[in-house]
Amino acid sequence: MTQRPAPETGEQAPDFDLRDQHGQRVRLSSYRGRKVVVLMFYPYAFSRVCTGELRKVRDDHPELVSDSVQLLAVSCDPTFALREFADRQDLAFPLLSDFWPHGEVASAYGVFDPERGCANRSTFIIDTDGVVRWAVHNAMPDARDLAEQGRVLAELTGPLE
């Protein structure tokens, strides 16, 4: 598996088909023409920073989970671990497993860390045409700025009602 460079703003987002925590297939291109996608890669289910971020999304950022926006959170954890993680944290949005082939989607987005065997903490906002409109990459221990993501989404989708 070859690590590609991360897609730049204005480029087509690589399509993928992954299973969520319930074993359901989720294909990025199925949202084209319907929803803006917030694609959040995170290193590990159950880790302190990742758990805190996803709980913050659940509690404080409804703009990341709405009728016009679809949040897809991706890690290299197996689906069974993601199911337990979602259940324990009461996470209703899709947690996608990039477990096998291990890190294939993270590699397509240029965010796979082969030494740690996980995705780096990165976010891509993808418009309804499947084009990357914003991306940010954070260091492993640093939580992402969810408020900034909200501002970018407001520019793409309009203010929350």
Show the residue positions of the predicted features.
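Chalcogenol-based redox active-site neighborhoods
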Residues: 1-161
